[in-house]
């Protein structure tokens, strides 16, 4: 598998020598050393676990230069050069590869090529040797980290602990901060909000992990993770809403309104600055933050309103939620008051903070980055938003229907608020409990699970309509197989952000609702190190030009990434397909006639007792038990690999035999073959240290799985009563044909030669839609039905 490397910054030999000297890797007297002496010293310096020169020299015999000679013996002959093969053998062993197991000592260059390592060459001078080691230190090891990070995990950089300054190498920050003495503290930011109605501004607990070096003169930037889960998660899955119910006439919709909560203006910060008096007992919950904490970036967490030990109530997705999370940044930049404890007597300042703030986090944590960025708050320099919601309607609804996130059937705004209302665990917080119960009733009514229609309530939770307020640089990360936060969320915010005068990048991986910072196929963590150094330390390191604007992981070969200028329909050519009465999906023949299927609702699914995931696979694979409740149309086999891009669109002329109805459409890749695993395989658990005796991550990647019959590419759902307007339901008569036109979730998917594309038209999606208790007939007029794709 290829260890692709995008974060290595091309560096001159002169600059490389300077950087090697700065980290004490290249000895000051290197010019007086012979080639063989320098080779011994540099190899020994990689072995950070050996703390004396004698110990380092003793370990040289453990390394082979070929299948006959160890390095110590090789050096006895005082060589003045080393061949590409010999150096490759030593380098591969330093990188963690095992000779005779991972590769052959007689052919190390093939191993390097296999894993996309930098090319090895003959080294005939000390200058070449020095630069070769510089490149080696910046090369990804078998554990996925660059060799310099492996050395850090063995204690190499403890020699710099206490110096109180950032050190850079190849444009990235080094782990020179003492992780054994991290300051862990809690402060209470006062909000302008009074969401619990007690007449006082809500206090928002904020947890800070920062380098001990920031106690003195060093000011450090902050990585802020707005995490509603940080205070704890209330498990309420057993109380999720019932979805086994019939559809409701959507014309009963009343357009529920958003109602703002009262404000209580907080006092301006005074000159008082008392050190924090509460120790943090919570743990960092985001690996990228831990990695960068060892490299000098403070890590800040807050769940804001409604979180454990704080005030207020959770109001999922609301402007109040955005305001409260934004207020933490205002404290970090000196514009808001915070206190040492809940008595509000002693102010404390983020005097350790440089005023430059970046944001990190996935899912809800990524969502709040989008929300805060739209406010244009001062000090927020960049966001790295992963698997984020850009409109809450697109999370819990779709085209006039109640639609669940994957594996979250019955969840909704009120239930998520309950999950995150961790201050309910504070037994004495009676104010929050009373306000919470009232808010739950309001959320239940306003979210309108009866009709699923767009409303003012949902409009207030659509961050995309405030995208013009974004002033910071932007990175979005999303899984193309994320059916929790569906890809529409990142696609639609990307269409806005890419037009703004800010630097922006997009990563699309093959995962579901997953992080990508520890994949074999891409050095994402190193890229983010480079990025945050540029944005928060304000060092010009070429980060903006270092990698393509859009990077997309291939669905056939996990170690292949596509460089694109954009992610949009424009990447491909439009192709129109028509379903025909004999079950074909044709580009040359128009469909005629009518076909009918009977939707069974959720009754058979409940009887089967299988999971929603198992149902979906059996359904898309065409198992008769489930496929009979659908219409399926298959293309001819593709003669050449074909990549689908952007958002497919369907037009369906359909009639139902009831006055309500829901239509689902799926695009499926058919053909029995190996496909990538749904989630990455862990190669070695806990093998990526973030620093010396600190936290760690695990190397993982998608790998070929057992053969399957089919794979879902994309899908979408629509309420038949929105045939005239996506935001306004209309009356529907039984038997009335209506023309539905809607887009599917966006994709970037390659169909290999020999695959077939299958269009499935159905109604009940057991994992996402409501599951009616009654059957319903749907008749599709093929003459008014078509599929528009964009193909590369």
Curated annotation (Swiss-Prot):
Top-level taxon in the UniProt lineage? Bacteria
The record's section on Pfam families has: Peptidase_S15, PepX_C, PepX_N
- Give the molecular function GO annotations: aminopeptidase activity; dipeptidyl-peptidase activity; serine-type peptidase activity
Q: Which residues form the active site?
A: 363, 482, 513
Supply the EC number(s): 3.4.14.11
Q: Tell me which SUPFAM superfamilies the record gives.
A: alpha/beta-Hydrolases, Galactose-binding domain-like, X-Prolyl dipeptidyl aminopeptidase PepX, N-terminal domain
Transferase in keyword set: no
Q: Which GO biological-process labels does this protein carry?
A: proteolysis
InterPro entries assigned to the protein according to its UniProt record, in alphabetical order? AB_hydrolase_fold, Galactose-bd-like_sf, Pept_S15_Xpro, PepX_N_dom, PepX_N_dom_sf, Xaa-Pro-like_dom, Xaa-Pro_dipept_C
Positions of transmembrane segments: none
- Key words of the record: Aminopeptidase, Cytoplasm, Hydrolase, Protease, Serine protease
Q: Which reaction does it catalyse?
A: Hydrolyzes Xaa-Pro-|- bonds to release unblocked, N-terminal dipeptides from substrates including Ala-Pro-|-p-nitroanilide and (sequentially) Tyr-Pro-|-Phe-Pro-|-Gly-Pro-|-Ile
Localization of this protein: Cytoplasm
What are the GO cellular component annotations?
cytoplasm
Similarity annotation: Belongs to the peptidase S15 family.
According to its UniProt entry, what is the function of this protein? Removes N-terminal dipeptides sequentially from polypeptides having unsubstituted N-termini provided that the penultimate residue is proline.
Q: How does it assemble?
A: Homodimer.
Q: Which NCBIfam families match?
A: PRK05371.1-2 (NF003781)
Q: What is this protein called?
A: Xaa-Pro dipeptidyl-peptidase
What are the leading ranks of the lineage? Bacteria, Bacillati, Bacillota, Bacilli, Lactobacillales
């Amino acid at each position: 598998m290829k260890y692709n490397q995008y974060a290595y910054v091309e560096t001159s030999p002169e600059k490389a020598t300077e950087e090697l000297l700065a980290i004490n890797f290249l000895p000051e007297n290197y010019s007086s050393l012979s080639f063989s002496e320098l080779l011994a010293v540099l190899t020994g310096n990689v072995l950070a676990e050996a703390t004396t020169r004698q110990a380092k020299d003793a370990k040289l015999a453990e390394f082979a230069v070929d299948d006959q000679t160890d390095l110590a013996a090789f050096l006895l002959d005082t060589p003045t050069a080393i061949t590409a093969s010999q150096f490759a053998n030593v380098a591969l062993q330093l990188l963690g590869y095992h000779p005779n197991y991972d590769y052959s000592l007689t052919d190390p260059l093939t191993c390097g090529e296999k894993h996309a390592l930098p090319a090895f060459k003959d080294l005939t001078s000390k200058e070449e040797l020095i630069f070769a080691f510089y490149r080696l230190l910046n090369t990804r090891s078998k554990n996925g980290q660059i060799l310099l990070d492996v050395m850090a995990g063995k204690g190499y950089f403890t020699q710099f602990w206490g110096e109180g300054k950032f050190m850079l190498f190849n444009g990235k920050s080094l782990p020179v901060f003492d992780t054994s003495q991290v300051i862990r503290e809690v402060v209470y930011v006062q909000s302008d909000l009074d969401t619990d109605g007690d007449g006082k501004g809500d206090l928002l607990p904020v947890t800070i992990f920062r380098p001990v070096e920031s106690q003195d003169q060093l000011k450090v930037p902050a990585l802020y993770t707005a995490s509603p889960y940080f205070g704890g998660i209330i498990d309420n899955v057993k109380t999720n809403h019932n979805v086994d119910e019939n559809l409701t006439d959507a014309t009963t919709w009343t357009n529920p309104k958003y109602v703002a909560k009262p404000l209580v203006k907080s006092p301006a910060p005074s000159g008082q600055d008392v050190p924090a008096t509460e120790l943090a007992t919570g743990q960092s919950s985001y690996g990228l933050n831990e990695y960068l904490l060892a490299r000098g970036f403070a890590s800040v967490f807050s769940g804001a309103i409604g979180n454990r030990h704080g005030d207020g109530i959770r109001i999922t997705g609301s402007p109040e939620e955005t305001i409260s999370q934004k207020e933490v940044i205002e404290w970090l930049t000196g514009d808001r008051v915070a206190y040492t404890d809940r008595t509000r007597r002693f102010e404390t300042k983020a005097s350790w903070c440089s005023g430059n703030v970046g944001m990190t986090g996935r899912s809800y944590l990524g969502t709040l980055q989008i929300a805060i960025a739209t406010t244009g708050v001062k000090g927020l320099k960049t966001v790295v938003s992963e698997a984020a919601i850009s409109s809450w309607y697109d999370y819990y609804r779709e085209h006039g229907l109640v639609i669940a996130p994957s594996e979250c059937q019955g969840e909704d705004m009120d239930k998520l608020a309950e999950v995150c209302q961790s201050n309910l665990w504070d037994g004495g917080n009676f104010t929050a409990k009373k306000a919470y119960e009232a808010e739950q009733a309001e959320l239940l009514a306003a979210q309108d699970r009866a009709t699923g229609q767009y409303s003012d309530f949902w409009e207030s939770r659509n961050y995309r309509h405030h995208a013009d307020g974004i002033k910071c640089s932007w990175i979005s990360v999303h899984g193309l197989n994320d059916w929790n936060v569906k890809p529409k969320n990142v696609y639609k915010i990307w269409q806005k952000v890419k037009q703004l005068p800010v630097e922006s990048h997009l990563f699309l991986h093959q995962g579901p609702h997953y992080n990508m910072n520890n994949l074999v196929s891409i050095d994402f963590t190193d890229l983010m190190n480079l990025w945050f150094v540029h944005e928060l330390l304000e060092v010009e390191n070429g980060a903006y030009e270092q990698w393509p604007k859009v990077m997309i992981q291939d669905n056939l070969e996990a170690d292949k990434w596509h460089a694109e200028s954009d992610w949009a329909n424009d990447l491909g050519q439009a192709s129109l397909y028509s379903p025909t009465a004999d079950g074909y999906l044709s580009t040359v023949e128009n469909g005629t006639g009518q076909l009918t299927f009977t939707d069974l609702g959720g009754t058979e699914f409940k009887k089967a007792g299988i999971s929603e995931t198992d149902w979906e696979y059996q359904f898309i694979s065409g198992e008769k038990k489930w496929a009979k409740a659908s219409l399926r149309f298959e293309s001819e086999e593709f003669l050449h690999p074909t990549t689908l891009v952007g958002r497919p669109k369907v037009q369906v002329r359909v009639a139902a035999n009831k006055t309500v109805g829901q239509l689902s459409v799926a695009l499926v890749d058919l053909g029995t073959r190996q496909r990538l695993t749904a989630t990455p395989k862990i190669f070695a658990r806990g093998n990526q240290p973030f620093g010396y005796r600190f936290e760690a991550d695990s190397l993982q990647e998608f790998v070929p799985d057992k053969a399957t019959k089919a794979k879902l590419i994309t899908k979408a759902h629509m309420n038949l009563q929105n045939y005239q307007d996506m935001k306004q339901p209309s009356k529907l008569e039984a038997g009335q044909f209506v023309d539905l036109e809607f887009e599917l979730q966006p994709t970037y998917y390659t169909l290999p030669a020999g695959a077939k594309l299958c269009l499935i038209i159905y109604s009940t999606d057991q994992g996402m839609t409501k599951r009616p208790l009654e059957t319903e007939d749907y008749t599709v007029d093929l003459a008014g039905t078509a599929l528009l794709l964009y193909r590369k």
